[in-house]
Amino acid sequence: MMNETGMAAAPAEAAWRIWQAPRQQTAFRQLMTAFSYPGRVVPLADGAESALLLVLTTLVDSACALADPLHALSSDDLRRLGVRSASVEAAEFVLADGNRLLEATPRLGSLENPEQGATVVMRVSRFGEGPHLRLTGPGIQHEQVLQVSGIDPGWWKQRSEWNAHFPLGVDLILVSGHEVAVLPRTTHINLKGAH
């Protein structure tokens, strides 16, 4: 990555870009692509950027509550985000690790306000490895296959229970390294034949 002098940007400078509006606007467009094409792996971050942190700097602000049961964010990052800390049950955004199930149910929204269901931002090991998830639903022409490793199989049962009464439910943003894939609550996951 080059800075305005044409020199390669230092890692600290590259990491700082995620706090700036132009980078967040680009990331927002990339995230909207991921939401529009469920299960498609989309490159989000580059260089020294953290895709997990870039998702948060792009989508959350001081009006949002964030649950970080992983303690994945530093106190400096939390301060810069300006979010309120909340429990998993009360937060609009929940950080999760694919290897550990949540011990509480995130917000599912209501019939009057289904958009108040939480967005779970989940760290996973890797895309392109692991079980084949066969996805169908809005934004998917016939079927999309997503391979992802580092997710406890119990997550799919939890997600199914949370999203059983559409339009209530949660949306998942899976994050691995510099890439993301989104599983909106409208996406159906078929694990049969997963290998």
Curated annotation (Swiss-Prot):
Coiled-coil regions listed in the entry: none
Functional summary from the UniProt entry: Belongs to an operon involved in hypophosphite oxidation. Exact function not known.
One of the protein's GO biological processes: organic phosphonate metabolic process
UniProt xrefs under InterPro entries: PhnH-like_sp, Phosphonate_metab_PhnH
Family in the record: Belongs to the PhnH family.
Native organism taxonomy: Bacteria, Pseudomonadati, Pseudomonadota, Gammaproteobacteria, Pseudomonadales
This protein's name: Putative C-P lyase subunit protein HtxG
NCBIfam families hit by this protein: PhnH_redo
Domain of life from the UniProt record: Bacteria
